[in-house]
Structure formats: C-alpha cells, structure tokens
Amino acid sequence: MSRYRGPRVRIIRRLGVLPGLTNKTPQLKSSSPNQSAAKKISQYRIRLEEKQKLRFHYGITERQLLNYVRIARKAKGSTGQVLLQLLEMRLDNIVFRLGMAPTIPGARQLVNHRHVLVNDCIVDIPSYRCKPEDSITVKNRQKSQAIITKNIDFSQKAKVPNHLTFDSTQKKGLVNQILDRESIGLKINELLVVEYYSRQA
C-alpha cells in the first residue's frame, strides 16, 4: 500500500487530530444519542483505526509500519513503546517536532530536497534513524534558510518536546535522548496496534 496523498481533512474527520498529517482540526458531525448507541464498533475496527492513526500521522506505508513492528518485537522492552520510539526518531519526524516544518509531509520534502543536515552532513533519507547527540541543522543556502525561517515563524507556538532542544537563532536542533512515552505528540493506544499486527509480525 502506497503513501496516502488524498484529502487530509477526510482522514482527521474519521480518526481525529493527527498533527503530523495536518495542522487543521476536524469538525465532527453531530449525531443523536440513539444513533451512537445503535452503532457498535468491533474490536477489529478499533485496532484498525489505531493502526491507521500511526500510519497517517507519520506518513508511512503499510509495509514500512509492519517492518517497524517486526523490529520492535525483536528489541528489548515493551513492543509498543519501542515502536513509537522508532517512529519518533525518524529524521522527518524530528525535523517536524523541532518546528522546522509545519507537518511531517513538509519535513519529508525538506529532507528529500537536501535542505537538512545531520552532524554537518546532508541526509536526504526521511526514514534515517536519529540517535542521541545528533545535531540537526539547515544547509547554509539562502533558499534553505528562508524556508526554515518561514516554517519556524509558523510553528513557534508548538512546544519542542523534552528529548529535543532547538536554537531558533542558529536554526539548530539537538537530539538529547531517546524520548519517553509522555513526549509522544499523538493520542494513541500503541498496544492495540501491536495486537492488530500480532498474526503478521
């Protein structure tokens, strides 16, 4: 299954707020109490929707998400928490969480177009896995600097999570540590995602 490129509002209307996909908030349709009571949601659908939240928020394909689940299963610790850490430490997500891009698709475009440096080296792979003490900077070109400055001004209200620091004057970010569960920028039940893939991973 390829990466989603359709209307983003339709997705958040179904799954709720997904800050990585879009900064818009969904306008939910009002339903009568009788309609809500009559609509029983299956356990499969609940797990499926949690999985879809992860996939659309981080902008990854079904195959990529399944691979991350398989890696998380082999690692020490809680599979769900390791899965979230793997996704959060992707370069495109780090660029987004630092406020250098308004969304993860926007961050992925910056990385693909070679605007972003990791430890002073250009990295154009959005899935690149960042690690503690990595520094994230912008290419010293007028176009690159202008894009990031505009994005920072747009995203300045967003709080940088505890595992990252960002110097807006130097346009430099730093990965301090692997993030903890509380720093995840998404309302998600990762255990349901692991359960969804229990027969596939």
Swiss-Prot record:
GO terms for molecular function: rRNA binding; structural constituent of ribosome. Residues 89-150 form the S4 RNA-binding domain. It holds the Pfam family Ribosomal_S4. One of its GO terms (biological process) is ribosomal small subunit biogenesis. The keyword Plastid applies. Keywords: Chloroplast, Plastid, Ribonucleoprotein, Ribosomal protein, RNA-binding, rRNA-binding. InterPro entries: Ribosomal_uS4, Ribosomal_uS4_bac-type, Ribosomal_uS4_CS, Ribosomal_uS4_N, S4_RNA-bd, S4_RNA-bd_sf. One of its GO terms (cellular component) is chloroplast. Part of the 30S ribosomal subunit. Contacts protein S5. The interaction surface between S4 and S5 is involved in control of translational fidelity. This is Small ribosomal subunit protein uS4c. The gene is rps4.
